[in-house]
Amino acid sequence: MNQDLSMNANQLVAFLQKPTSEFTKADIISFIQQKDIRMVNFMYPAGDGRLKTLNFVINNQAYLEAILTCGERVDGSSLFSFIEAGSSDLYVIPRFCTAFVDPFAEIPTLSMLCSFFNKDGEPLESAPEHTLYKASKTFTEVTGMEFQAMGELEYYVIAPDTGMFQATDQRGYHESGPYAKFNEFRTQCMSYIAQTGGQIKYGHSEVGNFTLDGYIYEQNEIEFLPVPVSQAADQLMIAKWVIRNLGYRYGYNVTFAPKITAGKAGSGLHVHMRIMKDGKNQMLKDGVLSETARKAIAGMMVLAPSITAFGNTNPTSYFRLVPHQEAPTNVCWGDRNRSVLVRVPLGWAAKTDMCTLANPLEAESHFDTSQKQTVEMRSPDGSADLYQLLA
């Protein structure tokens, strides 16, 4: 058994003993047959930023092979505003590397994200997912490097206020229960997201915490690990779908809205980025920010208008981007500064083995911490067109 995969929460990874990037059609069919999966879902992001779903009952193996190979027709004009009804048919073709067992389905169901294709069987050039794919591919072809990203997904949970163990207003950062009321909900979300293939770094309660008209509003965050940029967008789409579905199950209202009310913390979707080559992080050189990293930051300064257009699509986005709320208000960058457009966070650049200092019985590990350095784009929020933003 591959020890790197033995603890993976995705059932297909555990069963097939291979990473998702190596999934084949034969793997999908084998898993469906041996795990008695009865339904297949095709899922795809539409212009409104939400995942759409097409359900299939598995009649026999021939039918299963047909839908996995040929996909299905959909009405593009009902999915995207830029497609006219007069010529709107599109194909959706599943991407096997995105397969996961639906954690909410009562009937055993395998779900996959899909790509859009036009009438000629070519990728739909205007599809946001394909735009990101092209940008990522071009970046690698031009630079010989890989662009990776990870998101910090912030959201509010809203439920009736019990009046017990009141948290301090706007002091909810990393709060524990019973002052933080929705830790169990967040950890269940994290478990389900991991089962769908999401690579999670951690979760915690966030700054925003207040009561209004008999309801408690508690802000939470789930942060991911850096992965290839297209995968980063996919897992954020699925994560939002998981959080909304679980909120519905619990009877909670969940919102990714950038701003709920003035004077309270808004919710962002900060994006961390790093550039990789031959498995090595290119963001540091000799313990300081590399020329490659500085060029990337300069590019983000130049592209700030486009980043804002795709990252802040709701009018309430701009009520969040105000001073004294840990939100950027100027096109600039800085070390450890949460008020800039691009922050350079702590990156374990010091040559100190903190683990041995905290745990005297441990020998020095010589752990390679250079992989950890990222730069963080802080302006986007939950209204973002994820694929266009990351492109």
Per-range role (PLM):
Residues M43, T53-N55, L113, Y156, ...:
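Structured core elements
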Residues Y192-Q199, H204-E206, I216, E221, ...:
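N-terminal structural module
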Residues N2-K35, M43, D48, L64-I67, ...:
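C-terminal accessory/tail domains of diverse enzymes
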Residues M7-Q11, A167-D169, H270-N281, F367-Q373:
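Short acidic (Asp/Glu) and glycine-rich catalytic loops that position anionic groups and cofactors
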Residues S176-A180, N209-L212, V227-D234, A257-K264, ...:
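Alpha-helix capping and helix-loop boundary segments enriched in small/acidic/polar residues
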Residues L113, E152-Q166, N209-E223, A257-G279:
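Histidine-centered divalent-metal-coordination microenvironment in nucleic-acid enzymes
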Residues V101-T109, E146-Q148, L212-I216, K264, ...:
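Short glycine/proline-enriched loop/turn "hinge" motifs that connect secondary-structure elements
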Residues M1-F210, V227-W241, Y252, G382, ...:
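ATP/Mg2+-dependent ligation/transfer catalytic cores
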